A protein has these predicted regions:
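Generic non-transmembrane alpha-helical segments
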Residues: 32-43, 86-94, 162, 166, ...
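Conserved nucleotidyltransferase catalytic core and NTase-mimicking acidic/glycine-rich helix/loop elements
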Residues: 157-256
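Conserved catalytic core of two-metal-ion nucleotidyltransferases
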Residues: 37-40, 62, 84-125
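A broadly used, surface-exposed interaction patch
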Residues: 69-89
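Extracellular/secreted glycoprotein ectodomains characterized by long, lumenal stretches
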Residues: 3, 49-50, 55, 60, ...
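Glycine-rich, often proline-containing surface loops adjacent to acidic residues and nearby aromatics
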Residues: 64-71, 140-142
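Glycine- and acidic-residue-rich phosphate-binding/metal-coordinating active-site segment common to enzymes
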Residues: 100-101, 110-161
Length: 256
């Protein structure tokens, strides 16, 4: 079996379902949760749309299956923290077990893992939103639709998925958005037909060479420095694992 065949089998086994299946899951979740969201939002709901890795086509098994972005109108005078907290409480009162995450509320709808991400839309004709960041008890501004389009237009989903799987195999603290942006930088100028082995090796080489001083900017807001989400120790651990992976003789020792 060639290296690319091995990596393709990993993707078949661990990457998430097709775009049609993801959309079907999203519509099922949306149908179950919209009555709760509509009542909670009290007339201030702007829109709801699929977001995160499920919308980007980069999801892997074992993580959130469906990400739902909940856009609240700019005219709502409730604070971002209150929006975040009351959404969680509304879902909990509806009978779901919830998890408070950094910018999202995690829950299960049947056997589907769901992340709900509430944000308040900026005034005017814009897709920019402000999100509550619970770990910092602060907020951030971003453009989720632009983030999604940036990844979908890159045609690098398979390499992003492989890098996520590699991260999980080695239990690294390597946030998904960092992975997305590093893969895009690593493969800048490479053909879309680049083989899985050549492309993934280039990603690992880039991580080894660049991650310690990488400067990754949120495509949805240049003021958000995504690389700051990792500590130096986390970056060092990822760099060392990339170096170790590049020294392995067999792909089965790198990702499985």
């Amino acid at each position: 079996m060639s290296g690319s065949d091995y990596l393709q089998n990993i993707l078949i086994r661990k990457a998430c379902c097709s775009e049609t299946e993801r959309l079907n899951q999203y519509n099922l979740v949306k149908g179950r949760l919209m009555p709760i969201i509509n009542q909670w939002s009290n007339g201030y709901l702007e829109e709801v749309f699929q977001s995160g890795s499920s919308a980007k086509g980069t999801a892997i098994k074992g993580k959130s299956d469906v990400d739902v972005f909940i856009s609240i109108k700019s005219s709502c005078d409730v604070t971002l923290q209150k929006i975040y907290e009351t959404l969680g409480e509304a879902v909990r009162q509806a009978g779901y077990n919830i998890r408070h995450q950094n910018v999202s509320i995690g829950l299960k709808v049947g056997n589907i893992d769901v992340d709900l991400v509430p944000g308040k839309k900026d005034p005017g004709n814009t897709n920019y939103h402000k999100l509550y960041v619970s770990k910092k008890q602060s907020w951030m501004q971003t453009n989720v639709k632009l983030q999604i389009q940036n990844i979908k237009n890159s045609h690098r989903a398979k390499f992003i998925q492989l890098t996520k799987i590699w991260r999980d195999c080695h239990r690294l603290a390597f946030p998904s958005m960092n992975i997305e942006l590093i893969v895009l930088e690593a493969l800048r100028g490479y053909s879309y037909d680049t083989s899985l082995t050549d492309g993934f090796l280039q990603v690992l080489r880039y991580i080894e060479d660049k991650i310690l001083d990488s400067y990754l900017i949120d495509p949805g807001n240049s003021g958000n420095i995504i690389s700051d989400d990792m500590t130096f120790q986390d970056k060092l651990a990822v760099q060392q694992k990339a170096r170790n992976s590049l020294s392995q003789q067999y792909w089965s020792s790198v990702v499985w």
